[in-house]
Amino acid sequence: MPKTRKQRSRRPRNQRPSTPWPISQVSDRAFSTGTLSTFSATVYRPIGAPFLGGFVPLGYTAMPCWPRAPNIRLPGTPSMDALSAQLYNTLSLGSPPSPPKELPAPSRFSPPQPLLRPPRFLHPSSTPLKNTPPSETIASSSPWESSCQPCPSPTLGSGPKTSTPYGAAPSCVSTSISSPPP
């Protein structure tokens, strides 16, 4: 039985298979038969800032840890070691943490003290007296004047104490609005 030869492909030897990357990118790399040298030529790149002569390696690429920060604290402040020791002493695991100190709750029986006196509302039809100069009229109608009559305190009255609902006008303001001019 005669031996038959396998036909070879008609492709010439110097033609390479097409690569997915551009040829210009491949042309400047050095290829060799060993895979280790190929990977070392393509993977490892110099790290640093480029300049005219080549690459200058930056300092932090080879350092295992960051350098210590310069001591810039003010002379009166404690160091971080002292602060951390103080914090560790106050937050020791042996004693249970104390609850945070809260402000004492306001009593239900004491009325809240107003920070400012409410202004007096005058009826629009009320006109100042004719014999007073305008400077005194302006000064006496000022809501911050000490001559304003304050609202009657509910604790001084003999009647039962009632609270004003939120949004409703206090009794002194509503009476001064609804009162007819003298």
Swiss-Prot record:
Compositionally skewed regions (Pro residues) per UniProt: 96-117
Protein name (Swiss-Prot/TrEMBL): Protein Rex
One GO biological process term is: mRNA transport
Q: What is its main location?
A: host cell
Q: Which domain of life is it from?
A: Viruses
Q: Where in the cell is it found?
A: Host nucleus, Host nucleolus; Host cytoplasm
Description of how the protein assembles with itself and partners: Homomultimer.
Q: Which family does it belong to?
A: Belongs to the deltaretrovirus Rex protein family.
Which species does this protein come from?
Human T-cell leukemia virus 3 (strain Pyl43)
Report motif location: Nuclear localization signal, and RNA-binding (RxRE): 2-19
Nuclear export signal, short sequence motif: residues:
83-94
Q: Domain description from the entry?
A: The RNA-binding motif binds to the RxRE, a complex secondary structure consisting of four stem loops and a long stretch of stem structure, present in incompletely spliced viral pre-mRNAs. This region also contains the NLS which mediates nuclear localization. These overlapping functions prevent Rex bound to RxRE from undesirable return to the nucleus. When Rex binds the RxRE, the NLS becomes masked while the NES remains accessible.
Residues covered by region (Homomultimerization): 57-71, 124-132
Annotated region described as Disordered, given as residue ranges: 1-26, 90-182
